[in-house]
Amino acid sequence: MGLRFKKVLNMNIAKIMIPKICTVVLHERSTIRQGLEVLAHCHYTAIPVLDAEEHYVGSVTEGDFLRHIIKTGTTDMKEQEKYSVRDILRRDFCPALSIEAEFDVVVDASLRQNFVPVVDSRNALCGIVTRRSLIAEIAASKK
């Protein structure tokens, strides 16, 4: 194993994470309509969800929104304003890792999740690690 790659394995998550300020998030009080609009605009398949204190509480996916639309039986956006993201939130989907987590733990999580939410000791979202950011860092270490 090359010296540069060993450095990647010892890397701090903060170096490869996309900071919260650059991350698309929803708040659990956002309406389903707002969530659908964000998904349509950003073309993501899953988005982290925060509470009022900016703590990470889970993630929602396109499928969560589709299941909700089927359950309510309407695609009327005015009607979807009656429901909040909290109603469809999956708290166990995309579990977060601590900013202190080891690099190999991040790699393992990225094999199961499209993105890995990164939180501080208060469970406040610091940012996310995507598969793309992870691969880019590994590729850069090979140069």
Positions of PLM-derived features:
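Short, low-complexity N-terminal regulatory "tails/caps" that precede and couple sensory modules
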Residues: M1-V8
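Bateman (tandem CBS) regulatory domains
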Residues: N10-T23, E81-F93
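Short beta-to-alpha loop/turn elements within the nucleotide-binding domains of ABC transporters
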Residues: M11, S30, V60, Y83, ...
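The conserved cystathionine-beta-synthase
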Residues: V25-H43, L50, P95-Q113, V119-R122, ...
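A glycine-centered beta-loop-beta connector
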Residues: L39-C42, I47-D64, S110, V118-S133
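A short, polar/charged loop-to-alpha-helix boundary motif
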Residues: D64-Q80, L134-K143
